[in-house]
């Protein structure tokens, strides 16, 4: 069973949106943790909270947004599960909506987590940008914006987690380089130039394409395989190590997820 950990308001709301079949752990100030007035207190005063992260599974996904004060407890909590394979999902907030203090917290957390990823303390760090996600949402209002953003994050991770553990009918799962731990995800329809990228990752060095092909295209689209191979060849010319897998589905449209990798630190 896949373990999902949500820290803070955003992390908890995202984890709670996942379907059944996951082990969900939510941690927030004022409930599982004390509520402190400063981020420094979360770093200094947290002790004896190992019971919150008591699970036998070896891999987990840890969802957190760095703009909240409670995010300062992340490093303490991650120390409790440092022997696990930790995939951190960082929710990058829209900075125009943040106070000066929140901006500082976000930038510090963003940089620290990237250093953790590069050092190997994290198995991976997926970056999700609220601003980028809003740019491709079909509609949202002030009241339900975050609800739609969270749904978009959940949808992509439920699919990616599922397909990474399934055997494809064509191709082989990507084996990224040891250093390629900073990541994001892209979504789009096959044959369509429009790309929905969850974060504008700079200096992409590797890409894994997960292609979900409907029955009609699987049987009758004689150009599709050339299209998929052509994308890999184009990436090779750009020095981007890439691979693809194909899964059959009963969806109306054929689409893909692309996991993009890099070892370069990101700035926002």
Language-model features: locations:
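Tubulin/FtsZ superfamily GTPase core signature
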Residues: 1-268
């Amino acid at each position: 069973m896949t373990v999902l950990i949500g820290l803070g308001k955003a992390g908890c709301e995202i984890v709670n949106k996942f379907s059944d079949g996951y082990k969900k752990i939510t941690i927030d100030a004022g409930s599982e943790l004390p509520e402190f007035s400063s981020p420094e207190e979360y770093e200094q005063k947290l002790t004896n909270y190992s019971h919150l992260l008591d699970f036998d599974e070896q891999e987990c996904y840890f969802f957190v947004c760095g703009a909240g004060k409670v995010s300062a407890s992340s490093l303490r909590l991650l120390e409790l599960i440092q022997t696990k394979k930790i995939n951190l999902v960082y929710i990058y907030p829209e900075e125009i909506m943040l106070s000066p203090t929140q901006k500082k917290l976000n930038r510090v957390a963003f940089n620290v987590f990237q250093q953790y990823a590069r050092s190997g303390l994290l198995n991976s760090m997926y970056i999700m940008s609220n601003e980028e996600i809003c740019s491709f949402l079909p509609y949202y209002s002030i009241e339900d914006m975050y609800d739609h953003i969270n749904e978009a994050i959940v949808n992509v991770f439920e699919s990616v987690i599922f397909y990474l553990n399934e055997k494809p009918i064509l191709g082989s799962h990507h084996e990224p380089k040891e250093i390629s731990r900073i990541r994001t995800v892209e979504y789009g329809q096959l044959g369509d130039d429009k790309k929905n990228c969850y974060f504008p990752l700079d200096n992409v060095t590797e890409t894994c394409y997960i292609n979900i092909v409907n029955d009609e295209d699987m049987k009758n689209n004689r150009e599709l395989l050339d299209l998929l191979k052509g994308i890999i060849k184009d990436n090779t010319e750009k020095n981007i190590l890439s691979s693809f897998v194909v899964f059959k589905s009963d969806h109306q449209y054929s689409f893909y997820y692309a996991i993009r990798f890099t070892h370069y630190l990101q700035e926002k």
